């Protein structure tokens, strides 16, 4: 199975996406009341900001962009060095949500305004319940992605060097958006960062290390 997935990285990502979405849907259906409401004093000092919806939604684009960029432009080992801890951390977060269901009571009572930003926040609140929050997957993924940009040597070339500081800015912006939109507590943020740092130091296996060239025929056998 491992050898097959190492030769079919796109299929590996597709299988994991299916697993993740199914697991998250199960959590949303079966865990309606959290055991713990996550909160700290710092949460009360952070104002709500509807404009933070922009970097928050950018997260959904950044993940597949980075994965496919490394898959096609970087040595295959760089792709797996991001993919394995990224998916492992998301799975650990899901397990945490099952073991200790967490939730939030931080959102504003009403989001005022008819502008695009206010409408987007209302749409987010309507579709994303304030449950299963600690650790923050948004934060974990952002930190893990940023570290991949600073690890891979392809971003040392002049034409790509700008992508490293850009990834840092985007990472910080996404993390800030989670608390500015009241989607997460600072505690969720801290544990998301900690999870990313711990998994980054783990001894990950080198999948398909014999393939050191970027992916040209990702689904070839």
Protein language model regions, located:
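Hydrophobic, membrane-inserted alpha-helices
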Residues: 62-67, 144-148, 169-177
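Membrane-interface loop-to-helix entry segments
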Residues: 47-61, 126-148, 186, 190
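N-terminal transmembrane-helix/juxtamembrane module of multi-pass inner/ER membrane proteins
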Residues: 1-65, 109-112, 221
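Membrane-interface loops
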Residues: 27-42, 72-158, 210-219
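Interfacial helix-loop-helix junctions of multi-pass membrane proteins
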Residues: 107-111, 129-134, 173-200
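C-terminal membrane module of polytopic membrane proteins
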Residues: 185, 191-221
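Short hydrophobic alpha-helices at membrane interfaces in multi-pass membrane enzymes
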Residues: 159-172
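Aromatic-anchored segments of alpha-helical transmembrane domains
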Residues: 21-26, 90-99, 169-179
């Amino acid at each position: 199975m491992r050898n097959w997935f190492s030769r079919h990285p796109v299929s590996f990502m597709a299988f994991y996406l299916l697993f993740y979405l199914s697991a998250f849907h199960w959590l949303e259906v079966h865990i309606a009341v959290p055991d713990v409401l996550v909160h700290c004093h710092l949460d009360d000092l952070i104002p709500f900001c509807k404009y933070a919806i922009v970097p928050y939604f950018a997260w959904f684009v950044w993940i597949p962009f980075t994965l496919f960029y490394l898959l096609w432009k970087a040595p295959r080992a760089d792709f797996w060095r991001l993919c394995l801890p990224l998916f492992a951390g998301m799975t650990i977060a899901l397990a945490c949500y099952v073991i200790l269901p967490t939730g939030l009571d931080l959102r504003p009572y009403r989001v005022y305004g008819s502008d695009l930003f206010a409408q987007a926040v209302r749409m987010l609140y309507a579709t994303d319940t304030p449950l299963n929050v600690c650790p923050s997957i948004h934060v974990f993924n952002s930190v893990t992605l940023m570290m991949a940009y600073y690890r891979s040597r392809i971003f040392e070339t002049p034409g790509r060097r700008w992508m490293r500081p850009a990834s840092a800015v985007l990472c910080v912006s996404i993390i800030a958006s989670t608390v500015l939109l009241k989607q997460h507590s600072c505690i969720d943020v801290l544990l998301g960062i900690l999870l990313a740092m711990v998994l980054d130091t783990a001894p990950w296996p080198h999948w398909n290390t014999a393939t050191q060239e970027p992916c040209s025929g990702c689904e070839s056998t």
